Amino acid sequence: MFGVAKRFWIPMVIVIVVAVAAVTVSRLHSVFGSHQHAPDTGNLDPIIAFYPKHVLYEVFGPPGTVASINYLDADAQPHEVVNAAVPWSFTIVTTLTAVVANVVARGDGASLGCRITVNEVNRPGMSGDSSSWKGWGHVRWFIEEVPAGAA
């Protein structure tokens, strides 16, 4: 009998430890994991309506310039306007919390410029022209505005 115990004492200890661990985990699950909490729908904070963002894309250049213009809409889907007369503009109005604004134009004139205006404010760094690239204009901007009092 002691010969069998000497030979199999390590596997017996492992079996006993695994059994004790299984019982302990089972009891802990029954104590801590048994409560079902229903969400309390009566205490929800009101949803804050975001003020609309008015995003204005503009492409400008010498009169008579014709341009191919690519821009992103409010859902960041690309659109193309081919052979548009310059000056060109397009307005997006959205209540999304964030908008990726991007406008790229390529024209046949000596210079071409692009501008993105948000809520009638043209911020620094939001316009570009083709002074270094003949006939190109490009502006990209990520717009995330939280109105005063909404935070």
UniProtKB/Swiss-Prot annotation:
Membrane topology is: Multi-pass membrane protein
Spell out the protein name for this chain. Answer: Probable transport accessory protein MmpS1
The UniProt gene name for this protein comes to: mmpS1
Main localization is membrane
Tell me if Lipid metabolism is a UniProt keyword of this record: no
**Compartment list:** Cell membrane
One Pfam family from the record: Mycobact_memb
Does Transmembrane helix appear among the keywords?
A: yes
Q: Span of the secretion signal?
A: none
